[in-house]
């Protein structure tokens, strides 16, 4: 039901890492360039945690343009680079990934090498019911969804013109940094 998640998992790290890593571990790491996180964000997945106050589900979705304070206020999991919304004593025990009948999505990763490289940009784009969802990694302090781009696409049939318009809008919604992997401008062009 989630071939786009399998696509992301197939390019995660080395074969040794893929054999030892867990999906929850990749989420808990809270890296904005974690390959398997954008498919989960696109699916509206929730992290299941347990702690002194019992069990709860925490949203993995962060929105483009959302501040740390806004993420904390709504109880999001990803707050900033390697900063998460777990309460003291809480531990992750699983993921809850909703399924939408007929969902279709694709994962893509841009990097400098074919294997064992961190993402320059990674993305999951798909249609879930009537909604299009666009999740981007490596272009903000957390993996993010692009609400303006999603709103533009909602309920519409894709055409080359609409895709071009959505791509332009998506580039304007991200705010990447320049680092050793790529300049901010290059990342925006990839989006």
Predicted regions mapped to residue ranges:
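C-terminal structural segment of proteins
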Residues: 1-191
């Amino acid at each position: 039901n989630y071939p786009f998640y399998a696509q992301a998992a197939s390019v995660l790290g080395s074969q040794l890492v893929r054999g030892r890593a867990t999906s929850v571990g990749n989420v808990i790491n809270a890296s904005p360039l974690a390959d398997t996180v954008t498919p989960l964000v696109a699916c509206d997945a929730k992290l299941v945690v347990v702690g002194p106050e019992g069990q709860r589900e925490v949203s993995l979705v962060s929105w483009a343009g959302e501040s740390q304070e806004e993420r904390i206020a709504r109880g999001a999991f990803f707050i900033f680079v390697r900063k998460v919304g777990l309460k003291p004593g809480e531990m992750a025990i699983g993921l809850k990934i909703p399924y939408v009948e007929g969902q279709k999505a694709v994962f893509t990763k841009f990097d400098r090498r074919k294997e064992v490289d961190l993402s320059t940009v990674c993305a999951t784009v798909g249609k879930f019911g009537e909604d299009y969802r666009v999740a981007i990694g490596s272009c903000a302090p957390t993996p993010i969804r692009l609400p303006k781009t999603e709103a533009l696409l909602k309920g519409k049939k894709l055409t080359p013109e609409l895709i071009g318009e959505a791509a332009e809008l998506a580039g304007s919604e991200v705010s990447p940094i320049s680092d050793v992997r790529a300049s901010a401008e290059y990342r925006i062009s990839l989006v």
